[in-house]
Curated annotation (Swiss-Prot):
Enzyme class: lyase
GO molecular function term, any single one: metal ion binding
Name of the protein: (12E)-labda-8(17),12,14-triene synthase
Motif DDXXXE motif boundaries: 90-95
Chain's role: Involved in the biosynthesis of the mercapturic acid derivative diterpene cyslabdan A, a potentiator of the beta-lactam antibiotic imipenem. Catalyzes the conversion of (+)-copalyl diphosphate to yield labda-8(17),12(E),14-triene (biformene).
Positions with a binding annotation for substrate: R184, R237, R316, Y317
Any coiled-coil regions, as ranges: none
Note on how the cofactor is bound: Binds 3 Mg(2+) ions per subunit.
Species classification: Bacteria, Bacillati, Actinomycetota, Actinomycetes, Kitasatosporales
Binding residues annotated for Mg(2+) 3, in chain numbering: N230, S234, E238
Binding site for Mg(2+) 1: D90, E95
A Pfam family matched in the record: Terpene_syn_C_2
């Protein structure tokens, strides 16, 4: 909701009851994952405050339990640590922090690029490169060369997208809507989630399967849905920071089409519902085949989409009057 004086406006939200109704499957390893994440943050102190650690560990452990509910306990922890690392890096070095000191973000990005290129172990005094080095070594041991390289490439894309986002976050009106729609799947981490899911769930598409139009269309629909849902859920929190409007779908739709914020939310919500219908159709089509890597991929994408729908109800994404942590991804 938004406030104008004493008036309260409820912003319209998309309805997913026909496409991704809850309750969603949940891993039995959520509590163990939460404990492991807290211990991992002791080894790699990525966040400065106990509150920030608590909020991020909570949403990450509960979120991954819905993202990959069939993963085994150790693989779920590995996936959770990767997602926590990405989110913590964005919270600490991306978005508004980066807009104030873009040079520092570029320097941090250079450090991570060296790690992704297979450089020497970074010192533990620099927790983000050190933690990334640890994660990459464990993923490399877990999978084959092709899957590992896809994961590393997706991480590079995500990190570079965060630099792009930081460059534009203070003046979102300068960003073309089409460019934003192409970049958003990278800044919301969903392409990295796709790559990690194949490793964690122990399946791998062939190049021919990956090139199939139904697979590409389904991946695009889920990737779009993830970013757009997140934009609607986090808009109020980001707008409360001011003075610029958030670099997000409602802002750019309003710039393109005019009208009120409520109209922009309604338009974005319609886009979400349409993309959810495309995703559901693709999942139903692929998952109905005999068990194979394609059916495993369809089920994985279904759970990933469900997890983004679930995330919107977490305190991290609630408005400022409801006590959310000052983060937005």
């Amino acid at each position: 909701m938004t406030r104008t004086g004493d008036a309260v406006t409820i912003l319209p939200q998309p309805d997913f009851t026909a496409t991704f109704p809850g309750p969603f499957p949940t891993s039995p390893h959520g509590e163990r994952t939460e404990r492991q994440l807290l211990g991992w943050l002791e080894e790699y102190p990525l966040l400065p405050s106990a509150r920030a650690r608590s909020v991020l560990v909570n949403i990450t452990s509960h979120g991954v339990s819905r993202t990959l509910p069939t993963a085994d306990a150790d693989d779920l922890v590995l996936f959770a640590e990767l997602l926590l690392w990405l989110t913590a890096f964005d919270d600490m070095h991306g978005e508004s922090n980066a807009a104030r000191d873009l040079v520092a973000l570029v320097d941090r990005t250079a450090e991570l690029t060296l790690v992704l290129a297979g450089g020497s172990p970074p010192p533990l005094t620099n927790p983000f490169p050190a933690a990334l080095y640890d994660l990459l070594a464990r993923f490399r041991a877990r999978t084959g060369p092709a899957a590992y390289l896809r994961l590393a490439a997706s991480l590079r894309d995500t990190i570079m997208a965060l630099v792009w986002e930081a460059h534009h976050v203070a003046e979102p009106e300068r960003v073309a809507l089409e460019t934003y729609l192409e970049m958003r799947p990278h800044t919301v981490f969903v392409r990295t989630i796709f790559a990690a899911a194949e490793i964690v769930l122990d399946y791998e598409l062939t190049d021919a399967q990956r090139a199939l139009a139904p697979v590409r269309h389904l991946e695009t629909a889920v990737a779009n849905l993830a970013g757009w849902i997140n934009d609607l859920a986090s808009y109020e929190r980001e707008a409360a920071r001011g003075p610029a409007q958030p670099l997000s779908l409602p802002t750019l739709l309003r710039a393109r089409h005019g009208g009120s914020l409520e109209e922009a939310f309604a338009r974005a919500g319609g886009m979400c519902e349409n993309e959810a219908a495309v995703a559901r159709q693709g999942i139903t089509s692929l998952a109905g085949d005999p068990p194979s890597a394609l059916t495993a991929h369809a089920r994985a994408l279904e759970d990933i989409a469900r997890s983004f729908v679930w995330h919107t109800s977490h305190a991290r994404y609630q408005g400022p009057k409801r006590g959310a942590a000052p983060t937005s991804r």
